[in-house]
Amino acid sequence: FSFHTELQVRITDINYAGHMGNDTVVSLMHEARYRFMAHHGLEELNVEGLGVIIADNVIVYKSEAFAGEVLMIGVAVTDFNKYGCDFVYQLTEKASGREVARAKTGIVFFNYQTRAVQKVPQSFLTLFAPERISS
């Protein structure tokens, strides 16, 4: 992963079982994706005038996380197709290096004016998949 960000598990992220709730992982993925995009000068609602919408989420839980722990979240972009790609994540507890989860978010690019899926913008390909740019 070429990009990493840190997020702390809050007490409000803890469920009745005493560990981080599964729904929190989706929120952490969203925040990490937002930070990744901002790091590259992008916004989820404006990549060459197109928005990003979520097509799917997959999470594989590896261990529990607890209030106060700091998670290091690695983010990368992979598996491009005509209309989108996958964001992949690895969540590890910073102090111990314990893996907490692996995840992916499938996204597609969307024109909110025409309400239609669009091809991956060239500028996004240039940043993350230069080998896929058509001449």
Residue ranges and their predicted role:
Residues 1-56, 110-135:
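Hot-dog-fold acyl-thioester-processing enzymes
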Residues 43, 49-50, 68-72, 88-90:
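Short, positively charged
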Residues 7-9, 16, 50-51, 73, ...:
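Generic secretory/membrane-interface signal
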